[in-house]
Amino acid sequence: MVKGKKPYIDRKKAVTFHLVHRSQHDPLVTDENAPQRVLLEAAARQQKPKDPEPPTDPAQRQEELKKFGIHFDDDYDYMQHLKKRENDVVWEFMENPNQARKQKVQDSEKPGPAPKLMLPSSVFASEFEESEGMLNKAAPQTLRLDWDPDVVAALDSDCENEELEDDFVIQAMAEGDSDDEEWDDEDGEEQSDMDFDSDDLNEDENEDELMDRLAPLMRERRFDDEEVKSRFTEYSMSSSVIRRNEQLSLLDDRFEKFYATYDDPELGDLALEDIEGNWHQKHPVVMQCFQEFKKKDKGIEYNKEWDRERIEKYRNVVEGEEDPTEELVEYEVDDPKQKKWDCESILSTYSNIYNHPKVIDEPRRSRRSSASTNPAPIQIDPKTGLPTNVLRGGVDGQLTAKALANLADESPAATGPKSLCAKSVLSTLSVLSIRPKDETHEEKKERKRLLKDYRNERRIEKKANTEAFKEEKKRQTHVKINQRTNQQGASIV
């Protein structure tokens, strides 16, 4: 930053805000026009509300504990484990240490006047908040066991929209008198001063009205002899408190039938005996199976003789030539032409009486016949790598200067510039590579051509020699292996 330039934001006078969700205690949380997120000052987030101090007087502390159902008479502070129902959430802002070093202010400096904010009130939270949040208000209440069962049954009944009679107050007072009746449970049987007779009941009253009238009398009734468990109640508190009216019973029956379809015997694959039906011969599935079977058994041929024999058998039975009650048994007849073996012959096939192990010897040949038919083999000298007895004029076929001179004399004369034919192979390459001083253009051209031809000839000769040596080496190796094998066999014998 250039020195002397005023910064866009003065960090000493700036106010930091955090964008947070609107509190559930805010009345505007359900307003669609109000924003769901508000600005919260960073300094305000660090302010944590202080919990009220517990009372120090023992008498006041015991009264406070009795409000929550704690009746212990010791000095332990049980109030430290209790929390408020509102469950206030406090945001604690942790400042970045790197930014804290940059924004350090000297202790001697005094804070300036509070900055003025020109922001609308809709971006901030409401000043007044409700004691209970919207989520706690909207949460459904569970079963209230402290309610009267008659009230629960009345709220759950399906006769809410029926018109009340004119004397409903008198009827209610008459039904209330039954609350003062006494019941004696000493012998396990319920007794009452009032006796009910089936003749006293009105025939026009239905079962629901009768149950409503008898509800106060059945308040303390035991349900030992009734089955209140189902697939979805599981002896719950609601099934024992709320009376099952006609609609709820119908709903329970439907659920029972629905759950019955998911029993263990109905799960998994269907049983094969339950599958019924038939397909005609031209059905696609039958034809597909036939085509697959036909592809697999292509080698099976149709035997007309076999079918003819079976038809003749059944025809004789139908025409009466054979007894139809007689059971036909098919069996295979051995071919008399087939060679039969006895036990001794079969065992002889597994024996080795005709097996005589022996080393096969090479047949001997006379020297005259071998010399006339087969020439002497070529032997390779291991020192020079050349065949022996091929250098004429040398002593014992060795490579000497005299033998090389004789070989050079016997070689045909070569044609070339300046008596090139009288030189050896090495001298020929040297002469063709060196350019003489008095060489003309034509001589140079001829020398280049000869050098090129010479190199091609040497390349072909070198390749031919390499192949010849490889073949000869293979042949010699094969001969040595055969000789070694024959020698070992001879030593064993």
Swiss-Prot record:
Disruption phenotype: Lethal at the second larval stage because of defects in pre-rRNA processing. RNAi-mediated knockdown in fat body cells results in accumulation of RpS2 and the pre-40S ribosome in the nucleus and overall decreased cell and nucleus size. RNAi-mediated knockdown in wing imaginal disk results in caspase-dependent cell-death.
One annotated GO biological process: ribosomal small subunit biogenesis
Compositional bias segments (type: Acidic residues): 176-207
Modified residues (Phosphoserine): S345, S369, S370, S424, S427
A GO cellular component entry from the record: cytosol
Polar residues composition-biased segments: 479-493
Coiled coil spans: 437-468
Subcellular location: Cytoplasm
Homology family: Belongs to the LTV1 family.
Protein name: Protein LTV1 homolog
Organism: Drosophila melanogaster (Fruit fly)
Gene for this chain: LTV1
